[in-house]
């Protein structure tokens, strides 16, 4: 039997047994499931869960309670990053990568089987929260594994491009989630969606999980990781090494990620609530909604996925030429400006202005998200890379994404869209501080 060929690029080795198609599919499918889960949960939290799992005295309290369960996932993600990062760094990327997908997928499917508050009372809410924690632990190991499989199998000079493969799962997940919701609503109607049909998207994720498992089980470990296994291992746990020896890239990397997380959840959670809510006025005199139908908003969000996909792919091509840091600096400046212009897009209240808000916002998300799968792993050595990239990415999510929509809702009620925009801009400034002090990694050899 022929051994898999290896090509040498300096000190880095590429294993040609894992083809470009294998790497792209294995990494993209997992991220697609992650974002499919996040999208369907965010939509269900806005449209359904405030009625089915939370009994509140007013609509705003119900929405905040439902959105708070989004935060549970981000609280659990660092635990998943520690757990899966440890096994991924010590024993192998492949099996860890498979286990994180299984935990994430099972937790999502179980949500589709849960009884509601009317059936078992507070236990329905507790079970929903436990499923979100399970999703979070699985997701905590998922992205880091996908990023490492892509980057560690990339030839020299193409790590940025290979790193966009897992990131392209985001627009795929968005399209699938919104398409499923639109299709179910069109077939069964909004009342059925609220009562029982919301379960279908969660149950259907089993198809994506099966595809992901099939592809991932055929992968082999990258030579750069196999070489690291043969070296003496540090006595400290990978997590402890990350937060001590590599604290600077860990901390600065978190700051870099925060603006993108806040923007993402303002786009898919806050803007969804604002667009679909009735055009009422808060006690402070600010508009609380635009009155768009769920179908119109979902269609516009699906159209904006084109912008997300294009900018992710474009980032992969350009960051291998101009560098990750330069690209991210200009992108984050764009996010800061976008935050200040938020009222210009949403106060108008027209379909056209809402479309451009979503299209430009998703484009900026893609520009910032695309480079992360190469940039964050490049900050850490091979023996601590899974833990380092996963912890950095997921703790940033804890501080950025978990509270974004929860903070934005009362900000809008008390200070209007200007307050929400300033909140986004301040987070962009935090990310710019991180980018100012962090090092470029484009030409760094993985070791």
From Swiss-Prot:
<feature type="topological domain" description="Periplasmic">
    <location>
        <begin position="412"/>
        <end position="418"/>
    </location>
</feature>
<feature type="topological domain" description="Cytoplasmic">
    <location>
        <begin position="85"/>
        <end position="96"/>
    </location>
</feature>
<feature type="transmembrane region" description="Helical; Name=4">
    <location>
        <begin position="120"/>
        <end position="140"/>
    </location>
</feature>
<feature type="topological domain" description="Cytoplasmic">
    <location>
        <begin position="317"/>
        <end position="325"/>
    </location>
</feature>
<dbReference type="InterPro" id="IPR004736">
    <property type="entry name" value="MHS_symport"/>
</dbReference>
<feature type="transmembrane region" description="Helical; Name=11">
    <location>
        <begin position="391"/>
        <end position="411"/>
    </location>
</feature>
<feature type="transmembrane region" description="Helical; Name=3">
    <location>
        <begin position="97"/>
        <end position="117"/>
    </location>
</feature>
<dbReference type="InterPro" id="IPR011701">
    <property type="entry name" value="MFS"/>
</dbReference>
<feature type="transmembrane region" description="Helical; Name=1">
    <location>
        <begin position="29"/>
        <end position="49"/>
    </location>
</feature>
<keyword id="KW-0812">Transmembrane</keyword>
<keyword id="KW-1003">Cell membrane</keyword>
<feature type="topological domain" description="Periplasmic">
    <location>
        <begin position="347"/>
        <end position="354"/>
    </location>
</feature>
<feature type="topological domain" description="Periplasmic">
    <location>
        <begin position="189"/>
        <end position="194"/>
    </location>
</feature>
<dbReference type="Pfam" id="PF07690">
    <property type="entry name" value="MFS_1"/>
</dbReference>
<feature type="transmembrane region" description="Helical; Name=12">
    <location>
        <begin position="419"/>
        <end position="439"/>
    </location>
</feature>
<feature type="topological domain" description="Periplasmic">
    <location>
        <begin position="118"/>
        <end position="119"/>
    </location>
</feature>
<dbReference type="GO" id="GO:0005886">
    <property type="term" value="C:plasma membrane"/>
</dbReference>
<dbReference type="InterPro" id="IPR005829">
    <property type="entry name" value="Sugar_transporter_CS"/>
</dbReference>
<feature type="transmembrane region" description="Helical; Name=5">
    <location>
        <begin position="168"/>
        <end position="188"/>
    </location>
</feature>
<feature type="topological domain" description="Cytoplasmic">
    <location>
        <begin position="440"/>
        <end position="447"/>
    </location>
</feature>
<dbReference type="InterPro" id="IPR036259">
    <property type="entry name" value="MFS_trans_sf"/>
</dbReference>
<feature type="transmembrane region" description="Helical; Name=2">
    <location>
        <begin position="64"/>
        <end position="84"/>
    </location>
</feature>
<feature type="transmembrane region" description="Helical; Name=6">
    <location>
        <begin position="195"/>
        <end position="215"/>
    </location>
</feature>
<keyword id="KW-0472">Membrane</keyword>
<feature type="topological domain" description="Periplasmic">
    <location>
        <begin position="271"/>
        <end position="295"/>
    </location>
</feature>
<feature type="topological domain" description="Cytoplasmic">
    <location>
        <begin position="1"/>
        <end position="28"/>
    </location>
</feature>
<comment type="similarity">
    <text>Belongs to the major facilitator superfamily. Metabolite:H+ Symporter (MHS) family (TC 2.A.1.6) family.</text>
</comment>
<keyword id="KW-1133">Transmembrane helix</keyword>
<dbReference type="GO" id="GO:0022857">
    <property type="term" value="F:transmembrane transporter activity"/>
</dbReference>
<protein>
    <recommendedName>
        <fullName>Putative metabolite transport protein HI_0418</fullName>
    </recommendedName>
</protein>
<feature type="transmembrane region" description="Helical; Name=7">
    <location>
        <begin position="250"/>
        <end position="270"/>
    </location>
</feature>
<feature type="transmembrane region" description="Helical; Name=9">
    <location>
        <begin position="326"/>
        <end position="346"/>
    </location>
</feature>
<dbReference type="InterPro" id="IPR020846">
    <property type="entry name" value="MFS_dom"/>
</dbReference>
<keyword id="KW-0813">Transport</keyword>
<keyword id="KW-0997">Cell inner membrane</keyword>
<feature type="transmembrane region" description="Helical; Name=8">
    <location>
        <begin position="296"/>
        <end position="316"/>
    </location>
</feature>
<feature type="transmembrane region" description="Helical; Name=10">
    <location>
        <begin position="355"/>
        <end position="375"/>
    </location>
</feature>
<feature type="topological domain" description="Cytoplasmic">
    <location>
        <begin position="376"/>
        <end position="390"/>
    </location>
</feature>
<feature type="topological domain" description="Cytoplasmic">
    <location>
        <begin position="216"/>
        <end position="249"/>
    </location>
</feature>
<feature type="topological domain" description="Cytoplasmic">
    <location>
        <begin position="141"/>
        <end position="167"/>
    </location>
</feature>
<feature type="topological domain" description="Periplasmic">
    <location>
        <begin position="50"/>
        <end position="63"/>
    </location>
</feature>
């Amino acid at each position: 039997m022929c051994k898999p060929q290896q090509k040498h690029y300096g000190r880095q080795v590429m294993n040609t047994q894992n083809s470009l198609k294998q790497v792209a599919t294995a990494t993209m499918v997992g991220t697609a499931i992650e974002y499919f889960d996040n999208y369907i949960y965010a939509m269900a939290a806005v449209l359904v869960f405030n009625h089915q799992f939370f009994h509140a005295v007013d609509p705003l309290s119900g929405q905040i309670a439902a959105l708070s369960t989004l935060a549970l996932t981000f609280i659990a993600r660092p635990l998943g990053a520690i757990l899966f990062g440890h096994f991924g760094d010590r024993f192998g990327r492949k099996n860890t990568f498979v286990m994180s997908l299984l935990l994430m997928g099972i937790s999502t499917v179980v949500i589709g089987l849960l009884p509601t508050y009317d059936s078992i009372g507070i236990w329905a809410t507790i079970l929903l929260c436990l499923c979100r924690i399970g999703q979070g632990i699985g997701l905590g190991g998922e992205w880091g594994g996908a990023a490492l499989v892509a980057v560690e199998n990339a030839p020299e000079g193409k790590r940025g491009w290979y790193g966009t493969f897992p990131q392209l799962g985001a627009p795929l997940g968005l399209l699938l989630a919104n398409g499923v919701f639109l299709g179910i609503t069109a077939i069964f109607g909004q009342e059925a969606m609220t009562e029982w049909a919301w379960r279908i998207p969660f149950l259907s994720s089993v198809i994506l999980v099966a595809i992901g498992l099939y592809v991932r089980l055929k992968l082999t470990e990258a030579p750069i990781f196999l070489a690291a296994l043969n070296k003496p291992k540090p006595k400290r746990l990978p997590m402890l090494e990350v937060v001590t020896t590599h604290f600077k890239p860990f901390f600065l990397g978190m700051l870099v990620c925060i603006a993108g997380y806040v923007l993402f959840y303002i786009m898919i959670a806050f803007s969804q609530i604002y667009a679909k809510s009735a055009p009422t006025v808060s006690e402070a005199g600010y508009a609380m909604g635009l009155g768009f139908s769920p179908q119109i908003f979902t269609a516009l969000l699906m159209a904006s996925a084109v912008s997300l996909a294009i900018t992710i792919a474009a980032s992969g091509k350009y960051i291998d030429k101009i560098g990750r840091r330069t690209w991210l600096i200009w992108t984050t400046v764009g996010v800061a400006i976008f935050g200040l212009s938020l009222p210009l897009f949403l106060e108008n209240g027209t379909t056209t202005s809402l479309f451009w808000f979503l299209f430009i916002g998703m484009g900026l998300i893609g520009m910032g998200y695309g480079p992360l799968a190469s940039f964050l792993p490049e900050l850490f050595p091979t023996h601590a890379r899974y833990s380092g990239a996963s912890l950095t990415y997921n703790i940033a999510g804890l501080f950025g994404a978990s509270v974004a929509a929860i903070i934005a809702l009362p900000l809008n009620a008390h200070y209007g869209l200007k307050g929400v925009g300033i909140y986004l801009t301040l987070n962009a400034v935090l990310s710019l501080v991180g980018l100012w002090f962090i090092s470029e990694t484009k030409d760094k050899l993985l070791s």
